[in-house]
Design a protein with these regions (language model features):
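Conserved acidic segment of CheY-like receiver
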Residues: 1-20, 54
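Acidic phosphotransfer microenvironment of two-component signaling modules
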Residues: 10, 37-41
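Alpha-helix termini
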Residues: 21-29, 162-165
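Short hydrophobic/Thr-rich beta-strand motif most characteristic of the beta2 strand and flanking loop
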Residues: 24-37, 45
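Hydrophobic residues at beta-strand termini and immediately following loops
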Residues: 36, 103, 132
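CheY-like receiver
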Residues: 41-125
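Conserved binding/recognition cores within well-folded domains
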Residues: 114-170
Length: 170
């Protein structure tokens, strides 16, 4: 699981990384953690890499957490977003970006284990794959990418999200 954390407060970022690593270890979850102190750099990374979980501060200079979340949603990237902020006023505004959760910085440590358990369950369910054989070998498709399966003239057609988006054959 690839987890990215973005917060402009270097002290909080360091503390959050330590606490998150402790929670991941206690829950026996293997993850790759990457930390960013600016939203600008993270936006570039989101375009190039697949990220499973984003922990985002909201109030940051240049590019705030909402702009990052908006960019992620527009690109239809399939990552879970968790906002982490000092301002509980942002909770309702955050719904616009379909977050997985919202953590208040003042008591995030109490909630983090539960949030990570739920994230792990969701992430595990997304990893499931459908495998089938064709001439020349096997093919794997992520179940979450399958829209529907139909048949015609004794042939099976699997319609997937990438097929619809890119209009390419598998």
């Amino acid at each position: 699981m690839k987890i990215v954390v973005c917060d402009d407060d270097e002290k909080f970022l360091k503390e959050f990384k330590t606490v998150l690593q402790e929670r991941l270890t206690s829950l026996e979850i293997e993850a790759e953690l990457t930390m960013y102190s600016t939203g600008k750099k993270l936006v570039e990374v989101c375009e190039q890499e697949e990220i499973d979980v984003l922990f985002l501060d909201i109030d940051m200079p240049e590019v705030d957490g909402f702009k990052i979340a908006e960019s992620v949603r527009k690109k239809e990237l399939n990552c879970l977003i968790v906002f982490c902020s000092n301002y509980s006023d942002f909770v309702f505004k955050s719904f616009r970006y379909e977050p997985f959760s919202f953590l208040c910085k003042e008591n995030y440590q109490e909630q983090l284990s539960d949030v990570m358990k739920r994230i792990y369950e969701k992430w595990n369910s997304r990893k499931k794959e459908f495998t089938y054989q064709i001439k020349g070998g096997g093919v794997r498709i992520k179940q979450r990418d399958i829209l529907y399966i139909d048949t015609s003239n004794h042939k099976i057609f699997i319609h997937t999200i990438p097929f619809i988006q890119n209009n390419k054959k598998l």
